[in-house]
Each structure stands twice: as structure tokens, then as C-alpha cells.
Amino acid sequence: MENGITEILNFIHKFVSNMLNWVTVGNYFGKDIYYMKLIDLHIHSTASDGSLTPTEVVNRADSLGLTAMALTDHDTVSGIDEALEAAKDLEMEVIPGIEVSCIYKEKEIHILGLYIDHKDPELLSFLKEAYQKRYDRNMEMLAAFNKDGFEITVEDLHCGNPKTVITRAHFARALLKHGYVSSVDQAFRKYLNPDRPYYRSRELITPEEVLNALQAAGGFPVLAHPLQYKLGWAGTEELVSMLKEHGLCGLECFHSSNNQDESGKLRKLAKKYALAPTGGSDFHGAAKPDIEIGSGRGGLRVSALYLDDIKLSMFMAGIGRS
């Protein structure tokens, strides 16, 4: 009986979603012309390594016609209140989110949390610990640069925002500002990538810890850009399977780094493990100038239908409900 009700709910959801997520924009010889509502569930601001403020990000996403966007800064929720305030009079939905780094088989992987309670005390305590580990790494890198004569300061790394979570992208911008490199990309290739002289690893938490923290905060955990970890398809599936066992709910199938074939394979992987397919541009602004909100790179388009699937999955699993 319960399975039958679930199937009916799923059918109704799919039917209504398909009706609601196409908007009539005109009529041509008696035929309606439609466009698809679009979303972007992976966006960064100056709260971490993006170049636009949360307000600027929201306004840009709205001007581009998005139905919804998620602010997912690295290891911080400090930009969410500003983003929500900027969107209070807009029809576009702003989703509180985050992108948390963790370690898997000596590789750094990222897990997104969508619809998190960004004021949850346990989450804030968890992020404070992660911030300290990142801070220690940053000071070690800064000391190494200064020892070798690079005139880079903490103020340079803040990029005008003392509350920002400093990443390697901030080091790249500081190197560019002082003329040590001609581009952000060159800074990474010459100094900041893992095989370069000024790279320093940091103590990372486990995926299980991240998933537990996101779930406790009512969030919907998603594995970000799964192909960037270069595990191969078998290794990627092994990672997805392990994360699923510990509470993973979604898989970022659509990303600026994927081609259409890769996105299709990831959708099949998501289906195999009963994960919601998600997608986002991974917009950073000036740090990745070829990636735009909502359209990313390589013809990226993420339908709002996928957000409906996420919301249904959350409802069925009781996520976010007290």
C-alpha cells in the first residue's frame, strides 16, 4: 500500500513539475513559445574565494533569470544572511548552502550542503574547527612566501573582506596584485598546486564527519564535481557508494567541468544509488572568468525540475523537518 502511494505521489510530482517549469514567453502563429526555468546550486561569493559579494551574486543571478540559486561558499556560512536579505523582495529563491572540504584516500573532496540551517550551533562549532585548520595552513604558506622574499600580507589575502575564508585563490590574487605572476592560473601552476613549492596541505576532516554535520543542520548533502577527483569511473562509483552509506543524498551531475557525455553517465550513477541529480556552475567571478552564473562552461543548463526532485526527496526523507 505504502509503495503504491509513493508511486502515485511521484507521478503527480513529475506531471505538475513538467507543467510548472516551462513558462510561456510568446505566441507564434498560434503556437506557444516556452523557455525552461533554470537554477544554479553551486555559487561562491567574497565570503570565500568568489569576487562578487553575496548581494552582487544574488542580483546577478536574478538579472539572468534564474528561478533559484544556492550560495555555497567554502567552509563558511558568513555570506548567507546578506544573500537572503538581498533576495527578500525577489521571486528567485536563495538556498542557504555550503561547500565543505574533507579527505578521501589522500585526496581532497568537496561535499555541498543545500538547505542547511546556517545558524545551527553544532554546524557553526564544526565550521569553526575547520576554519582553524585552514587558517593554520594559510599562515604556514604565508610564512614560506615571506621567507623567500614575497611581499604578501594578511591584508592582501583578505582582498578587502576581513571575514572571508582564505583559500589558495586568495594567494593567487595577491601574487597577481604584486606582479609576481601574470594571471591567477599561472599562480596555481607556478606556486600553489599540490606539486608546487609553496603548497601546504591542511588537516582535513572525514566525509563521515561532514555528512553528519550537514544532516544535523537539516541539510541535503551532495557530492560536488565528482569527476574532478580523477578516481576513474570505478573509483568514483566506489566513493559514491561509500558516501551513500553515510547519508549522501545527491550527486552533482551537471557542472562546468563536465561534458554532456560525462553528465549523462553521472545521471545513471545517481539513479543507480537513488541519489538526486543536481547541478551548478561553480561560479567564482574573476577567478574563473569563463564561468557565468546559470550557464557555466560548455553549455551548462540546469533545469528547475531537478530542484523539485530535491525538494521531493527531502520531503520523503523528512529532511529539514523538526
PLM segments and residue spans:
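Extreme N-terminal basic, low-complexity initiation segments
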Residues: 1-10
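Intrinsically disordered, low-complexity segments enriched in small/polar residues
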Residues: 2, 21-24, 28, 292-297
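An N-terminally biased module of ancient metal coordination in phosphate/nucleic-acid-related enzymes
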Residues: 6, 22-107, 191-194, 205-288
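Extended substrate/RNA-proximal surfaces in nucleic-acid metabolism proteins
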Residues: 86-237, 241, 298-321
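C-terminal active-site subregion of NodB/CE4 polysaccharide deacetylases
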Residues: 274-280, 285-303, 307-313
